């Protein structure tokens, strides 16, 4: 699996912005990726030293849409989140402007 296939996109929220001060960065990752794969991908793409990787599966939410024909329900997609802790003194430059 390619490193760019593992890291899908960064997750930017108010809470994650506060975590960046502690050297923790959040990414949406491929569901079949494991912690060693995520660590290697972040080190390859951003050229930083990774101290730890925490992962969690985010379950899709129920979505209900009201139409002329009644209600239609479905789920948003499930996805995997990874919180990557960098070694002390390390930073990812693209996040510094946020």
Swiss-Prot record:
Family: Belongs to the universal ribosomal protein uL23 family.
Assembly mode: Part of the 50S ribosomal subunit. Contacts protein L29, and trigger factor when it is bound to the ribosome.
Keywords: Ribonucleoprotein, Ribosomal protein, RNA-binding, rRNA-binding
PANTHER family linked to this entry: 60S RIBOSOMAL PROTEIN L23A (PTHR11620)
UniProt keyword Lyase present: no
Cellular component aspect of the GO annotation: ribonucleoprotein complex; ribosome
Function: One of the early assembly proteins it binds 23S rRNA. One of the proteins that surrounds the polypeptide exit tunnel on the outside of the ribosome. Forms the main docking site for trigger factor binding to the ribosome.
Any one GO BP annotation for this protein: translation
MF-aspect GO terms: rRNA binding; structural constituent of ribosome
Keyword hit for Repeat: no
Listed name of the protein: Large ribosomal subunit protein uL23
InterPro entries, alphabetized: Nucleotide-bd_a/b_plait_sf, Ribosomal_uL23-like, Ribosomal_uL23/eL15/eS24_sf, Ribosomal_uL23_CS
